[in-house]
Design a protein with these regions (language model features):
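Short alpha-helical transmembrane segments in multi-pass integral membrane proteins
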Residues: 1-42, 98-163, 205-260
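Hydrophobic alpha-helical transmembrane bundles that constitute the permease/transmembrane domains
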Residues: 1-7, 14, 41, 45-60, ...
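Short amphipathic alpha-helical segments, especially helix-boundary/capping motifs
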Residues: 33-37, 55-59, 70-75, 112-116, ...
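Hydrophobic alpha-helical transmembrane segments of integral membrane proteins
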Residues: 34-36, 69, 82-86, 92, ...
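Generic hydrophobic alpha-helical membrane-segment signal
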Residues: 35, 42, 54, 156, ...
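Helix-terminus/linker motif at the lipid-water interface of multi-pass membrane proteins
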Residues: 49-82, 100, 138-147, 208
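Small-residue-rich hydrophobic transmembrane alpha-helices
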Residues: 72-136, 167-190
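C-terminal structured "cap/appendage" subdomains that terminate the fold
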Residues: 173-177, 184-196, 203-218
């Protein structure tokens, strides 16, 4: 039903810029465009699969830590997801903003606006996380009245607030890079950070050293830290714009002055 509704809206064309006639769906395929789409879609899909599988594995670590820890971990993730909603929205916006600016050749504007979105997300999410952390126990009481579960939730929400300043560099920046067709770099970084940090560090701290669910979350924060460093470096150096080279300024030759 949703797909039919979308096709109907596009065919009617409430926005003339988005009007797509039904005849256009039966035209010959343009494989050059398809390859460009696949160049972004395939790395993004691989990144999503790797992230989901790694997150599932870390949840298996928590599954053997008792019902109170499992419940507290689930509730903390739910609260953290609510806190991160503005950042997720800005991440989606960064893809659109950079893609739109680069599509019309405004390379400098794309770079400036991605930085603005990044800092807006960083400051906003940090403020939200730090303001809501003191009320972690109150928010947990909407889910349960078990004191052990609430204790786990409070610890995890405070840890989440402590590491929130690096969240935007981990997730908003790669979303903006995808708007510049720089999806492969995000894929390789995600593979390295997920399996080299979140899974390994989470297992070592949470299982081998006995830190429990805190160790598993520290593995997640190590994943954030690696992603934040690599993606921030990518933004600062401007290498995420490698498919959009800047035009070289033309050198003006000085004409010799002829004296009369």
């Amino acid at each position: 039903i949703g797909a039919v509704a979308i096709l109907w809206v596009l065919a009617i064309g409430f926005n003339p810029a988005l009007r797509i006639s039904l005849k256009s769906y039966f035209k010959q395929l343009n494989f050059s465009i398809i390859w460009e789409v696949m160049g972004i879609g395939i790395p993004a899909s691989v990144e999503s699969v790797l992230f989901t599988s790694g997150r599932l594995l870390t949840q298996m670590f928590v599954a053997g830590m008792g019902t109170s820890v499992i419940a507290g971990n689930f509730i903390a993730f739910s609260i953290a997801a609510l806190i991160n909603l503005p950042g997720s929205a800005l991440g989606s916006a960064s893809t659109i903003i950079t893609g739109r600016r680069l599509g019309v050749g405004q390379i400098a504007q794309a770079e400036i606006q991605l930085r603005h979105v990044f800092w807006l997300s960083t400051l906003g999410l940090t403020a939200i996380a730090w303001l809501t952390a003191p009320f972690a126990g109150l928010m947990a009481s909407f889910y349960t009245q078990d004191p052990q579960v609430k204790h786990v939730v409070v610890i995890l929400i405070w840890l989440n607030a402590l590491f929130m300043p690096i969240w935007s560099a981990s997730w908003v920046l790669p979303a903006g890079f995808k708007g510049a067709r720089d999806a492969r770099y995000a894929m390789w970084v995600s593979m390295l950070s997920m399996w080299g940090c979140r899974v390994v560090v989470g297992y070592v701290l949470g299982i081998m050293l006995g830190w429990g669910v805190v160790g598993v979350w520290m593995g997640m924060f190590a994943d954030w830290a690696v992603r934040a460093v690599l993606f921030y470096w990518r933004m600062v150096t401007g290498r995420w714009l490698w498919k959009y080279p800047r035009p070289e300024p033309q050198k003006c030759e000085k004409k010799p002055v002829v004296s009369e």
